[in-house]
UniProtKB/Swiss-Prot annotation:
It comes from Arabidopsis thaliana (Mouse-ear cress). InterPro entries: DYW_dom, E_motif, Eplus_motif, Pentatricopeptide_rpt, PPR_At4g14850-like_plant, TPR-like_helical_dom_sf. Residues 559-634 are annotated as: Type E motif. Residues 666-760 are annotated as: Type DYW motif. GO terms for molecular function: RNA binding; zinc ion binding. Residues 635-665 are annotated as: Type E(+) motif. The gene is PCMP-H21. This is Pentatricopeptide repeat-containing protein At1g20230.
Length: 760
């Protein structure tokens, strides 16, 4: 308090002075008393004193009257740091961070340098706003004022850099800190763990030991959580073992943090050891531990462990039930998962968004796509709002069965609840539209995304690859390389697959070599499969076979399947038999191999061999997988089976087929009987061909949609040559765009032409 203002203070009633100086006025006084005190101060002329003004600012701020507090500050001719710091502290406490920065700027323009009390508040503001550049400037100010070595300033500066994701700057501050504590060390350990920097974690732990700072269980839990959340699962397990060797007793948080990593690494034996420890420590009653244990067994494929643990848990708790449903679904027991979900509903258990998302995802991942769509609708009727995880879990179901109407509705929902900025939602939309034949909409979604990660780029490349648009895929890849993102093995799978669709052999070899030479990505089985397909389709079957023999690991069924399919295209019986023999050994119960080899024999007129294959299938009890197609009409998905005569509209479908058949004969088209059984009459062969599920679905669509409406059909098998020719004709005859997605690729029929160029 200045000497000049003392006489003025004496004119203020002692009750007002006592009110302002009371340590409890923030909590016990009233706003009216503050305004009265302000009036008395103005009357006495003591308003210019920094101490009195600071007290007024604090008092007004206590009632969130920040405008009044700021007016007091602005009325001071020569404000002090104390006056500014009072308002900065109050605004920061009220989480008005932007205003805090504004007051700091005014303080700095007055030539006032923040002290060790103001700086921690300012660094906190920068941390909350992720305002790294402003924080860096304040760091410079602290260096100029010599306060950068103050313990409180260093601590707040360190946490600011951590919150802004500037690990390098945070580490520099940490290394200069003279007063490190376990909290600061733990924060740095956790951050390095999230980045998977095991060596740095070990180095800091060593430095802590040298400095006499002992890591506590919170430190270890932070490390485990960091490794787990960043996907560095093996590092998490290594660190868990280190904790145990150091003599620490892992608690329920430690166990819950490491178990997801154990499951993702499929370390079942380690999981069992932890299970034993959990029993010994009496942690089985903890719902988080039980959930993590069930999740671990689910990821490790140990179904008995899932069911046994769930049955041991006495309470019906949402988290445990969610883990149980997810574990069952992950292991193909989706019917059991649905049964349990219905049981939970009957017991009026409070099912949250995680519960619904778990069962929807389980259905979508296990071929229960229609059930997934129904559950999504039921979820909303129940008043549970889907979130950024639910939408990406449900959209694959729309794509799997080409439920474009449902997909668009879900897209609209995502727009209404402002989820489009989420990269997972965006990626799922890109994939859904691509699978529904609307690759142009995939491109639009991609272009509108404010932020794109590698998954988004891969989804778009895969979509165009699925449609056989190799030039577009290569163009997208070139754009990807101009970003800071690095392509991964999935990126190159899309590239190689696209090259294979259109026979770009040179480009395929270029990308195959690029992935290892420029990006250090070792080719996987899927890359070799794509190359075999590419070479085989280009007529270089021997080169494809040589590549298989040179593989650094054993080829799988996908690789041999690619060779066998290429042999079908090139009518090469010798290599087909070699590939088929390998497939018989790898997948003895897969009827597709027998059927494909039989078709190759039939194309060569080798009917004795065809009979031999059929007899072999019969002796093994194998039957050709029945053809099945799906089409969406008026927001409802219909399933049509090959040769099914029980369909309610079968008479109208047959009549329409006869009409189309007559028109085709007029134009000179004859059925391709190579795709029918050879040992039946020609008329019966034709009837069998017209009974193929994709034809039934297309004709059903013609009957039940307005003229000009595009048709979208999904088939569970590869489209045959006769169906391909017929649907080409229908697209011209009926004036329809028809999208067919089979197991190999997309076929876009328009005006009698197919996007595949009749080569698939």
């Amino acid at each position: 308090m200045t000497k000049q203002v003392l006489p003025l203070i004496e004119k203020i009633p002692q009750s007002i002075v006592g009110f302002l100086e009371s340590s409890s006025y923030h909590w016990s006084s009233s706003l009216s008393k503050t305004t009265q005190a302000h009036a008395r101060i103005l009357k006495s002329g003591a308003q210019n004193d920094g101490y009195i003004s600071a007290k007024l600012i604090a008092s007004y701020s206590n009632y969130n009257c920040f405008n009044d507090a700021d007016l007091v500050l602005q009325s001071i001719p020569d404000p002090t740091i104390y006056s500014f710091s009072s308002l900065i502290y109050a605004l920061t406490k009220a989480k008005l961070f932007t205003q805090s920065i504004g007051v700091f700027s005014r303080m700095f323009s007055h030539g006032l340098i923040p002290d060790s009390h103001v700086l921690p508040n300012l660094f906190k503001v920068c941390a909350e706003l992720s305002a790294f550049k402003v924080g860096k400037q304040i760091h410079c100010v602290s260096c100029v004022s010599g306060l950068d070595m103050d313990a409180f300033v260093q601590g707040s500066m360190f946490h600011m850099y951590m919150r802004c994701g500037r690990m390098g700057d945070a580490r520099k501050v940490f290394d200069r800190m003279s007063d490190k504590d376990v909290v600061t060390c733990s924060a740095l350990l956790c951050a390095y763990a999230r980045k998977g920097c095991l060596e740095e974690v070990v180095r800091i732990l060593s430095e802590m030991e040298s400095s006499g700072i002992e890591a506590n269980i919170v430190s270890w839990n932070g490390i485990l959580s960091g490794f787990n959340r960043s996907g560095y699962h093996k590092e998490a397990v290594v660190m868990f073992q280190k904790i145990h060797h150091l003599g620490f007793c892992p608690d329920q948080v430690t166990v819950s943090s490491v178990l997801p990593s154990v499951g993702d690494s499929e370390m079942l034996n380690m999981g069992r050891l932890i299970h034993g420890y959990v029993i010994k420590q009496g942690l089985l009653k903890d719902k988080c531990v039980i959930s993590a244990m069930i999740d671990m067994y689910g990821k490790s494929g140990h179904v008995y462990g899932i069911i046994s643990l769930f049955n041991q848990f006495e309470m019906m708790e949402a988290g445990v039930c969610n883990a149980y449903i997810t574990g069952l679904s992950r292991n193909g027991l989706v019917d059991k998962a649905l049964e349990m979900f219905e049981l939970f509903k009957e017991q009026t258990m409070e099912l949250n968004v995680v519960s619904w998302t778990s069962i929807i995802a389980g259905c979508a991942q296990n071929g229960k796509d229609i059930e997934a769509l129904e559950l999504f609708r039921e979820m909303q009727v129940a008043g549970v709002k889907p979130n950024h995880v639910t939408i990406p879990s449900m959209l694959p179901a729309c794509g799997n069965i080409a439920a474009l109407g449902h997909g668009r509705s879900t897209h609209g929902f995502a727009v209404r609840v402002h989820l489009l900025d989420n990269v997972h939602v965006g990626s799922a939309l890109i994939d859904m539209y691509a699978k529904c034949g609307r690759i142009n909409l995939s491109q639009i979604v991609f272009n509108m995304m404010p932020t794109k990660n590698l998954v988004c780029w891969n989804s778009l490349m895969n979509g165009f690859s699925m449609h056989g648009k190799a030039k577009e895929v290569m163009s997208i890849f070139e754009s990807l390389m101009r970003t800071r993102l690095k392509p991964d093995f999935i990126s190159f799978t899309s590239l190689l697959s696209a090259c294979g669709q259109v026979g770009l052999t040179d480009e395929g070899w270029k990308y195959f070599k690029m992935m290892s030479e420029e990006y250090g990505i070792k080719p996987r089985l899927e890359h070799y499969s794509c190359m075999v397909n590419l070479l085989g389709r280009a007529g270089k079957l021997q080169e494809a076979y040589d590549l298989i023999k040179e593989m650094p690991f054993e080829p799988d069924s996908c690789v041999w399947g690619a060779l066998l399919n290429s042999c079908r295209l090139q009518n090469n019986v010798d290599l087909a038999e070699i590939a088929a023999e390998k497939l018989f050994h790898l997948e003895p119960e897969n009827p597709g191999t027998y059927v494909l080899l039989s078709n190759i024999y039939a194309a060569k007129g080798m009917w004795t061999e065809v009979d031999s294959i059929r007899n072999k299938m019969e002796s093994l009890g194998l039957k050709k997988n029945p053809g099945c197609s799906w089409i969406q009409v008026k927001n409802r998905v219909y399933t049509l089976l090959a040769g099914d005569k029980s369909h309610p509209q079968i008479d109208q479908i047959t009549e329409k087929m006869d009409e189309i058949s007559k028109e085709m004969r007029k134009s000179g088209h004859r059925p391709n009987l190579d795709f029918a059984l050879h040992d039946v009459e020609e008329q019966e062969q034709e009837q069998m061909l017209w009974g193929h599920s994709e034809k039934l679905a297309v004709v059903f669509g013609l009957l039940n949609t307005p003229d000009g409406t595009p048709l979208q059909v999904i088939k569970n098998l590869r489209i045959c040559g006769d169906c391909h020719a017929v649907i080409k004709f229908i697209s011209s005859y009926a004036g329809r765009e028809i999208f067919i997605r089979d197991t190999n690729r997309f076929h876009h029929f328009k005006d009698g032409i197919c996007s595949c160029g009749d080569f698939w």
